[in-house]
Amino acid sequence: MATTNCLLALAIAGLVLVSLPGLSRGDVDARRGRELAGGCNPSGTLRPSRSHSCQDCCKAGRSYPTYACSPATTGSTKAVMTLNDFEAGGDGGDPSECDGKFHKNTERVVALSTGWYANGRRCNKNIRINANGRSVLAKVVDECDSLHGCDKEHAYQPPCRPNVVDASQAVWDALRITGEDVGEYDITWSDA
């Protein structure tokens, strides 16, 4: 009886892994992007032909979803805040789209996923970010490109997920998010 139950459990686990291949690959980022995409479906995929040496860089042969949209905005839009280095030589890649400049990480600045960036309509405008029981204003200076990536312009990083507010260290500091929580953090945001 115990052997039958064990075999049944293994069969069910195998069925789940076959039905949901992302689970067997440990594809956490892809699952998280789908979970928070809010009706925004991938518009395509990028499959780089070569890998790069940084930890977060694209890997050859791996597929990365691209998005032309972001979830609809509300008075309290759910998003994932990520950490970005807006300075020259940082992981942000090229200068900011809105003003063609690099920014100090002591400035409260953000890049928004392609759909929220809205072809630059939010450039140089403030958004309000709420997290960790705090609220902060940050200026939109760049696009976190959800359509392109894995190239020099994008610091060899994958395309942005459709639900990202990519924030400078100053934003994280103002929200008093520190230690192991820095990197990715669930937030809400709105136009200010």
UniProtKB/Swiss-Prot annotation:
UniProt name for this protein: Putative ripening-related protein 2
Record-level GO cellular component terms: extracellular region
Signal peptide positions on this chain: 1-26
Subcellular location: Secreted
Keyword terms: Secreted, Signal
The organism of origin for this protein: Oryza sativa subsp. japonica
PANTHER family, alphabetized: RIPENING-RELATED PROTEIN 2-RELATED
Domain of life: Eukaryota
Matching Gene3D superfamilies: RlpA-like domain (2.40.40.10)
InterPro entries according to UniProt: Kiwellin-like, RlpA-like_sf
